[in-house]
From Swiss-Prot:
It catalyses: [prokaryotic ubiquitin-like protein]-C-terminal-L-glutamine + H2O = [prokaryotic ubiquitin-like protein]-C-terminal-L-glutamate + NH4(+). Specifically catalyzes the deamidation of the C-terminal glutamine of the prokaryotic ubiquitin-like protein Pup to glutamate, thereby rendering Pup competent for conjugation. Also displays depupylase (DPUP) activity, removing conjugated Pup from target proteins; is thus involved in the recycling of Pup and may function similarly to deubiquitinases (DUBs) in eukaryotes to prevent or promote proteasomal degradation of certain proteins. InterPro entries: Pup_deamidase (IPR022366), Pup_ligase/deamidase (IPR004347). Belongs to the Pup ligase/Pup deamidase family. Pup deamidase subfamily. GO terms for molecular function: ATP binding; hydrolase activity, acting on carbon-nitrogen (but not peptide) bonds, in linear amides; metal ion binding; peptidase activity. NCBIfam families: depupylase_Dop (TIGR03688). This is Pup deamidase/depupylase. One of its GO terms (biological process) is proteasomal protein catabolic process. It comes from Rhodococcus erythropolis (Arthrobacter picolinophilus). Coiled coil: none annotated. ATP binds at G6, V7, E8, V9, E10, S102, A103, N158, R240. Its cofactor is ATP.
Length: 499
């Protein structure tokens, strides 16, 4: 299987020494501190190229109007605008009041795990460097999606899809899937409702913030299916499915199955497999009901009158993917591995969700919380449980509860720590992220700006030179590796590419 995938995570941020600190300011400090520690001075830090971005274009065929206002800030060090492009092809920047790591494009779900996990190491270093600045507040970063005060911030997935596939088919095929996949990839949350005031535990941190079936916006009226039509690639050939319903995962199996199963269901949809019989009667309500039931026994209503659990819905998707793959002449090892792990996890969850406490986030978190509740005699309404929930997602290797579970062998990993550390500084080799990252590594001082689909060189002439990268599977090591090795300067590279 080969589908371009990208994961972007807004991290929670706090300053224990200065609780009233402005999060936009502290997020800016984190990004700038990481840049300084990486030895990238302000004058040489590549800017993000916003010219080709169109975040208000809707896949349903219209643009959401943007109210007139001041021009966007262009000073990359201004508060709230800090940005850097990393040599691994990722983007590290301030998005609203959060530091965000947007991983480079990958073509394999396991690589999505590796470069997403690399983002955790980047953020841990960013907080550490920012906190070491004399007089600066101590920062802590969390890979989660809620602040405990009613606000949610996103972990977004991106999948490159064929423009030929009707968007209505994507909505039909994915809505029941997204509603039910949280049984596997929910990260777990103490509290019910957006503010978390109602006592209890639920599967997903994001579900209570889903309010409509389909929508363009990502900060209010969030939809099960997001309609942003901004492919960051050849728009005549591709669309980018922008997924906002997912949680920030720490468990590698959760991330692997989250992106891997979604990619396989997209294969079904693009092949024209009929999934209309799985339509939900009340999709938004189903999202909430499935999340609020850690027993996994409650059912949701389908449009045809059937009642199914989230597990049962996932089982149907698994069966249809398996049947689809059985028709393929050449078996794909990655697809087979995802299907095998998908089936294994569903079997374990059906028998006892706690059997997944060493591989999935929400059961791991629930086991920690239940142990703490039993030792301390706490009800689910106890405020201390919210602190345990938060500490699970702390990115510090010695403090975060998830990381401590890994250290003592209580959470299984799918990748090695060396693979993750290599990915902090190196790009994937089989997507255009390789070209972007290697250009930054070799010729960073000569690059004025970059984006997902272009690299802009400043060679000292009257005009900047934009090299488009509209094909995500070009610009790979196989495609441009020898060329990059054969040139000694950015000018020579640009000359080779343009003549």
């Amino acid at each position: 299987m080969q589908r371009i995938i990208g994961v972007e995570v807004e991290y929670g941020i706090s300053s224990p020494s200065e609780p009233s600190a402005n999060p936009i300011l502290t997020s800016t400090q984190a990004v700038l501190a990481y840049a300084a520690a990486a030895g990238v001075p302000r004058a040489k830090r590549t800017r993000w190229d916003y010219e080709v971005e169109s975040p208000l274009r809707d896949a349903r065929g219209f643009d959401l109007g943007r109210m007139s206002g001041p021009a966007p800030v262009i000073d990359a060090d201004e508060i709230g605008a800090a940005n850097m492009i990393l040599t691994n092809g990722a983007r590290l920047y301030v998005d609203h009041a959060h530091p965000e790591y947007s991983a480079p494009e990958v073509a394999d779900p396991l690589d999505a795990v590796i470069w997403d996990k690399a983002g955790e190491r980047v953020m841990e270093a960013a907080a550490r460097h920012a906190s070491s600045v004399p007089g600066a507040p101590r920062l802590q970063l969390y890979k989660n999606n809620v602040d405990g005060k009613g606000a949610s911030y996103g972990t977004h997935e991106n999948y490159l899809c064929s423009r030929d596939t009707p968007f209505a088919s994507i909505v039909t095929g994915l809505t029941p899937f997204f509603a039910s996949r949280q049984v596997i990839c929910g990260s777990g949350r103490v509290g019910l409702g957006q503010s978390g005031d109602e006592a209890g535990f639920q599967l997903s941190q994001r579900s209570d913030y889903i309010e409509v079936e389909v929508g363009l916006e990502t900060t209010l009226k969030r939809g099960i299916i997001n309609t942003r039509d901004e492919p960051h690639a050849d728009a005549d050939k591709y669309r980018r499915l922008h997924v906002i319903i997912g949680d920030a995962n720490l468990a590698e199996m959760s991330t692997y199955l989250k992106v891997g199963t979604t990619a396989l269901v997209l294969d079904l949809i693009e092949a024209g497999v009929d999934l209309t019989d799985l339509q939900l009667a009340r999709p938004v309500t189903a999202v909430h009901h499935i999340s609020h039931d850690p027993t996994l026994r409650k059912t949701v209503a389908l449009a045809d009158g059937r009642e199914l659990t989230g597990l049962a819905l996932q089982r149907i998707y698994l069966e249809r993917v398996s049947k689809f793959l059985d028709r393929e002449a050449d078996r794909d090892p990655r697809a087979d591995d995802i299907v095998a792990k998908w089936a294994m996890v569903l079997d374990l969850l059906e028998r006892d969700p706690m059997e997944c406490a060493n591989i999935l986030d929400w059961p791991a978190k629930l086991r920690l919380l239940e142990g703490f509740r039993n030792r301390e005699g706490l009800a689910w309404s106890a405020p201390r449980l919210h602190l345990v929930d938060l500490q699970y997602s702390d990115v510090r290797l010695d403090k975060g509860l998830y990381n401590r579970l890994v250290a003592r062998g209580s959470m299984e990993r799918l990748v090695t720590e060396q693979q993750v550390l290599d990915a902090v500084t190196n790009p994937p080799t089989d997507t255009r992220a390789y070209f972007r990252g290697e250009c930054l590594r070799r010729f960073g001082a000569d690059i004025a700006a970059a984006s997902w689909d272009s690299v802009i060189f400043d060679l000292g002439g009257e005009s900047l030179i934009r090299i488009p990268t509209l094909e995500p599977l070009r610009g790979t090591k196989a495609h441009v590796g020898a060329l990059l090795d054969s040139v000694d300067s950015a000018a020579e590279l640009v000359d080779q590419l343009t003549h």
